[in-house]
């Protein structure tokens, strides 16, 4: 009886540890300068392809055309 109780408690402990590791690994974030997506967020700042403090707008040829 003692063996069964110990093995069940060890099994439950392993499940709890795996859930804890899953939460830690899925909630990580990336520092500035690292590639990011909406599913891989920045720790701080904004995701503009890479983690940055401010997104700079990039204009095409039509926007820079001068008469």
Curated annotation (Swiss-Prot):
GO terms for cellular component: extracellular region. The modification Phenylalanine amide is found at residue 59. It comes from the Eukaryota. One of its GO terms (molecular function) is potassium channel regulator activity. Residues 1-26 form the signal peptide. Expressed by the venom duct. It is found in: Secreted. Its main location: secreted. Disulfide bonds join 29-43, 36-48, 42-51, 47-55. Residues 63-67 form a propeptide. Keywords: Amidation, Cleavage on pair of basic residues, Disulfide bond, Ion channel impairing toxin, Neurotoxin, Potassium channel impairing toxin, Secreted, Signal, Toxin, Voltage-gated potassium channel impairing toxin. The cysteine framework is XI (C-C-CC-CC-C-C). Belongs to the conotoxin I2 superfamily. Inhibits the vertebrate voltage-gated potassium channels Kv1.1/KCNA1 and Kv1.3/KCNA3. This is Kappa-conotoxin-like Em11.8.
